[in-house]
Curated annotation (Swiss-Prot):
Lineage of the species this protein comes from: Bacteria, Pseudomonadati, Pseudomonadota, Gammaproteobacteria, Pasteurellales
Protein name, as recorded: Translation initiation factor IF-2
An MF annotation (GO) of this entry: guanosine tetraphosphate binding
Region spans: G3: 392-395
Compositional bias segments (type: Basic residues): 189-205
Biased composition (Basic and acidic residues): 62-102, 111-165, 206-229
Annotated region (G2), positions in chain: 371-375
C-alpha cells in the first residue's frame, strides 16, 4: 500500500445524502386519527463530525512533519554520496609512487595506451554517477515539498468545508413542514437567479435542467447561501463595531494616597479610596464598629480603616489656620509682677459673699436673690497699695461647673468654712477642685463671733482631707474672721498677699491680651455681654477678640461698677460688648490681628463642634438602639430653660437632667440666655413643654402665645424652688402605688346552714370594722386559705353595711362554704399611695 493510499484511508469519512430520498412519518390529526406523512429530502449535505475535523488536522500536521523529515534525510544522503565520490576522484587522480617514479626514460616514453584509455573511462563514469545522485536528491526534495503543500491544502479545505456546513447542521432537526418550506424557497430563489442573470431556459419538470447536474445545482445553492450569510455577518459586524465601548475594566484596584483630615464621613473616605461605601462599612463591622454612610469618623479610626484596605494615609491637621492665628503673638514682651486672682469658695450660706462685701465695702449680698450667689462675681480691690482680684463662686450643689471654672482661672483659693457648721459637702468639693487645679488654699474660718463657734473642730475635720494647718506642721494658713463685724479681714488680706509673693506671679503687660470668659449673658439692649478675666497682655477698646465659637471687635468695656474703661491689664475682670454671640463660660478669649481670620477660625470651630456632636449622637443612637427598644414607655417631662447668665443655664440644665429616673425623664427641649421670646413660646407649645424663667421675663408677644396656647410658664429667682417644683411635677407623672390596709377582723364562733346562702358564719368582730362591700380573706391558723368578697352581712335578721368592733354578726362568704369554727375573716381595702421623687 502506497503512502498516498494510506493517507486517503486515514482521512475522515463523510456522510453523503442522496438528492431525492423519501420516507414516511406517522402523525396524529386533530380528530385523533393516525395519518401517514411523506417526507422528501432534496438536499445534498455533508456532515462532518468533530472527530473528523480533529482527524483532518492531525493528518495535516503528521503529513507536514513526515515530508520535512523525508526531505531532510534525502538531503543528508545526497551530501554523503557527493562526499564519497569526491574522495574517490582524489584517490584516482593521485598517482602512486610506483607510477610517478619512472623506471627509466625509455619506459615513460613507451606508456601503455590501453591503460590511459581505461582511466579516462573510469573518470567519466564517476562524473555521471555524481550527476545522477544529485538529480535524484533534488527530485526527492521537490516531491517531499509538494506532498507537504498538498496535505496542508487538503486539511485547509476540510476545515473550510466544515465551517460551510455549520449552517446546514441542524437541517434534520427541524420539522418536515419547515424543511419543505425552506426547500421551496431555495428552488424559487435558484430559478429566479438562473432566469434573471444567466438568461437560461426554464428548468425541466422535476427541477432539472439540461446544463447542470444535481451536484452542481446543490453547490450553487450552497454558495449563494454562504454569500448571504457572509453579507449578514459583515453587516452585523459593522453595526456591532459602532456600538462597541472603549472602556476596559482595570484588572486591579489602584492603591492611592488618602489625605485624611481630623474628621471625615464614611462617604467621603470611600470616595477618596475609589471604593464603595459598603466596603468601608463591612471593614468596620469586622473591626467591631457599627457605622452608617453619613457617620463622621475621627482621624485615628479613618486611618485604621484606610490602612486595613491597603491605602497609604496622609494625615492633615485642619486647625493649621487656628494655630497660626493663635501663635501670632508678641513673644519678646517683658513680664512684670501681676495681681493675684483669688477665688472664694465654700459651702452655701457659709458667708462667702458677706466676707467679700466687707472687703469691697459694698452691700452685694443683700442684692442676691435669697441671699445666695447665682453666678460668678468678679471684683478687684486695692489694699495696702496692692490690687487683689476676687472671684465669688456659688456654693449651691448645682453650680459645680462654675466652681470648677473659678478654680482653673485662679491663683489662690480662699476656702470659707462656718465655725458653727463645720465641713460640708460643697466644702469637700471645693477642696477637690483646688487640688485638681493645683492651686494653694487659704482657709477662712467664718462666723467666729457666734457663741456656738468651734474653730478647732473645723481644723480637725479638714485634717481628713489633707488640709493641714501651719500649727500642725502643714502649709495651709488658717485665718479666723467675722464677715459681719469685720474682725480678722485684714489678716486674711495679708495672708493672701503673702501667698502671692511666694507664688511670684508674673504676666506680659504690654502685649496682645488673652484671658478666660468667667460669665456671659445676653442683654436686650446691649447684646451679648461677656465677663472676661484678662490673664496676660492688655485688652483695649477696638481689639479683635476670638472667644470660643464667637468673635468680634471690642465696642465697649466696663468694670464691675459699670464704669466705662478703655483698657484692662492682667488680673483685671471686665465686661466686654461687641461679640457676635454669647460665648460659653470657660472659653479662652484671645486678641488676634485679623478679623477675617478670626471669623474663619470661629466658623471652623462651629463646624467641627457640629460634626463631633453629630458623631456622638449617631454613636449613641446605634449603641442604645436595642436598649431603647427594651425600655418600653417612659414618661417624659419637656422643659425649656431661659436664664439671665450662661452659668445659671448650665447649672439648671445639669440639675434637671440629674433629676431623671427610670420612670420619668426630664428632657430639656431648649435653653438659652436672655428673656423669653415668642420663638421660645412656640417651641413650648409644639413640644408640650413647661417654660422656666430664671431671673428673666417674657415679652409681650411671647405672653400672647402663652395665653392662647395655655402654656405652663413659671418664674424663679432661687434655684432651690425651681428644682423642688420640677420634682413635684415629675412626681405627678409617676405611676401610683396601691397598698392594702386591713380595716377589720372577725372570728368565726359558730356555723349555720342557710338554704339560699349555704354556710353562714356566726362571727364576733374583734378588731376594726367589717364592711359589706370590701374584699376579704379567710385565715385558718394564720394561713390565707381563701380570698374573695362577702355575699351577705347581717346583724340578727337585718342586712347591714358595716359591723363595728365588739359586735356579733352573720357573714356569708361568696363562693366558699368550707368555713369552720375558729377561722378568722380579715377585711381590707386597697388604698392608692402617691409617690414622690
Amino acid at each position: 500500500m502506497t503512502e498516498k493510499e494510506q493517507n486517503a484511508e486515514n482521512a475522515p469519512k463523510k456522510l453523503s445524502l442522496k438528492r431525492r430520498e423519501k420516507t414516511t412519518v406517522s402523525a396524529t390529526t386533530a380528530g385523533g386519527k393516525a395519518k401517514a406523512v411523506q417526507v422528501e429530502v432534496r438536499k445534498s449535505r455533508k456532515i462532518d463530525t468533530e472527530a473528523a475535523i480533529k482527524a483532518a488536522e492531525a493528518a495535516k500536521l503528521k503529513a507536514q512533519e513526515e515530508a520535512e523529515a523525508k526531505a531532510k534525510a534525502e538531503a543528508e544522503k545526497a551530501e554523503q554520496e557527493k562526499a564519497t565520490a569526491a574522495k574517490v576522484r582524489e584517490k584516482a587522480a593521485k598517482p602512486t609512487k610506483a607510477e610517478a617514479k619512472p623506471e627509466n626514460s625509455t619506459v615513460a616514453k613507451a606508456a601503455d595506451p590501453e591503460k590511459e584509455k581505461r582511466k579516462a573511462e573510469e573518470a567519466e563514469l564517476r562524473r555521471k554517477a555524481d550527476e545522477l545522485a544529485r538529480q535524484k536528491a533534488e527530485e526527492q526534495a521537490r516531491k517531499a515539498a509538494e506532498d507537504a503543500k498538498r496535505y496542508a491544502e487538503a486539511a485547509k479545505d476540510t476545515v473550510e468545508h466544515h465551517n460551510d456546513s455549520d449552517d446546514f447542521s441542524d437541517y434534520h432537526l427541524t420539522s418536515s413542514y419547515a424543511r419543505e418550506a425552506e426547500d421551496e424557497d431555495n428552488r424559487r430563489r435558484e430559478n429566479h437567479i438562473r432566469t434573471g442573470k444567466n438568461k437560461v431556459t426554464k428548468a425541466k419538470k422535476g427541477g432539472r435542467d439540461d446544463n447542470g447536474s444535481k451536484d452542481e445545482r446543490s453547490a450553487d445553492r450552497r454558495n449563494q447561501k454562504d454569500m448571504r450569510g457572509k453579507g449578514k455577518q459583515s453587516k452585523q459586524g459593522k453595526r456591532g463595531s459602532t456600538l462597541q465601548q472603549a472602556f476596559t475594566k482595570p484588572a486591579q484596584v489602584t492603591k492611592s494616597d488618602v489625605v485624611i483630615g481630623e474628621t471625615i464621613t464614611v462617604a467621603e473616605l470611600a470616595n477618596k479610596m475609589a471604593i464603595k461605601a459598603t466596603e468601608i462599612i463591612k471593614t468596620m463591622m469586622k473591626m467591631g464598629e457599627m457605622v452608617t454612610i453619613n457617620q463622621v469618623l475621627d482621624q485615628e479610626t479613618a486611618q485604621l480603616v484606610a490602612e486595613e484596605l491597603g491605602h497609604k494615609v496622609i494625615l492633615r491637621k485642619e486647625n493649621e489656620l487656628e494655630e497660626s492665628v493663635l501663635e501670632d503673638r508678641d513673644v519678646n514682651a517683658e513680664k512684670v509682677q501681676r495681681a493675684p486672682v483669688v477665688t472664694i469658695m465654700g459651702h452655701v450660706d457659709h458667708g462667702k459673699t458677706s466676707l467679700l462685701d466687707y472687703i469691697r465695702k459694698a452691700k452685694v449680698a443683700a442684692g442676691e436673690a435669697g441671699g445666695i450667689t447665682q453666678h460668678i462675681g468678679a471684683y478687684h480691690v486695692e489694699t495696702k497699695g496692692k490690687i487683689i482680684t476676687f472671684l465669688d463662686t456659688p456654693g449651691h450643689a448645682a453650680f459645680t461647673s462654675m466652681r470648677a471654672r473659678g478654680a482653673k482661672a485662679t491663683d489662690i483659693v480662699v476656702l470659707v468654712v462656718a465655725a458653727d457648721d463645720g465641713v460640708m459637702p460643697q466644702t469637700i468639693e471645693a477642696i477637690q477642685h483646688a487640688r485638681a487645679a493645683g492651686v494653694p488654699i487659704v482657709v477662712a474660718v467664718n462666723k467666729i463671733d457666734k457663741p456656738e463657734a468651734n474653730p478647732e473642730r473645723v481644723e480637725q475635720e479638714l485634717l481628713q482631707y489633707d488640709v493641714v494647718a501651719e500649727k500642725f506642721g502643714g502649709d495651709v494658713q488658717f485665718v479666723y474672721v467675722s464677715a459681719k463685724k469685720g474682725s480678722g479681714v485684714d489678716d486674711l488680706l495679708d495672708a493672701i498677699l503673702l501667698q502671692s509673693e511666694v507664688l511670684e506671679l508674673t504676666a506680659v503687660k504690654d502685649g496682645m491680651a488673652s484671658g478666660v470668659v468667667i460669665e456671659s449673658y445676653l442683654d436686650k439692649g446691649r447684646g451679648p455681654v461677656a465677663t472676661i478675666l484678662v490673664q496676660s497682655g492688655t485688652l483695649k477698646r477696638g481689639d479683635i477678640v476670638l472667644c470660643g465659637f464667637e468673635f468680634g471687635r471690642v465696642r465697649a468695656m466696663r468694670d464691675e461698677d459699670g464704669k466705662d474703661i478703655n483698657e484692662a491689664g492682667p488680673s483685671i475682670p471686665v465686661e466686654v460688648l461687641g461679640l457676635s454671640g454669647v460665648p460659653a463660660a470657660g472659653d479662652e478669649a484671645t486678641v488676634v490681628r485679623d478679623e477675617k481670620k478670626a471669623r474663619e477660625v470661629a466658623l471652623y470651630r462651629q463646624g467641627k463642634f457640629r460634626e463631633v456632636k453629630l458623631a456622638r449622637q449617631q454613636k449613641a443612637k446605634l449603641e442604645n438602639m436595642f436598649s431603647n427598644m427594651s425600655e418600653g414607655d417612659v414618661a417624659e417631662l419637656n422643659v425649656i430653660v431661659k436664664a439671665d447668665v450662661q452659668g445659671s443655664v448650665e447649672a439648671i440644665v445639669q440639675s434637671l437632667q440629674e433629676l431623671s429616673t427610670e420612670e420619668v425623664k426630664v428632657k430639656v427641649v431648649g435653653s438659652g440666655v436672655g428673656g423669653i421670646t415668642e420663638t421660645d413660646a412656640t417651641l413650648a407649645a409644639a413640644s408640650n413643654a413647661i417654660m422656666v424663667g430664671f431671673n428673666v421675663r417674657a415679652d409681650a408677644s411671647a405672653r400672647r402665645v402663652i395665653e392662647n396656647e395655655n402654656i405652663d410658664l413659671r418664674y424663679y429667682s432661687i434655684i432651690y424652688e425651681l428644682l423642688n417644683e420640677i420634682k413635684a411635677a415629675m412626681s405627678g407623672m409617676l405611676q401610683p402605688e396601691f397598698k392594702q390596709e386591713i380595716i377589720g377582723l372577725a372570728e368565726v364562733r359558730d356555723i349555720f346552714r342557710h338554704p339560699k346562702f349555704g354556710a353562714i358564719a356566726g362571727c364576733m368582730v374583734t378588731e376594726g370594722i367589717v364592711k359589706r362591700n370590701n374584699p376579704i380573706r379567710v385565715l385558718r391558723d394564720n394561713v390565707v386559705i381563701f380570698e374573695g368578697e362577702l355575699e351577705s352581712l347581717r346583724r340578727f335578721k337585718d342586712d347591714v353595711n358595716e359591723v363595728r368592733n365588739g359586735m356579733e354578726c352573720g357573714i356569708g362568704v361568696k363562693n366558699y362554704n368550707d368555713v369552720k369554727v375558729g377561722d378568722q375573716i380579715e377585711v381590707f381595702e386597697v388604698v392608692e399611695v402617691k409617690r414622690s421623687i
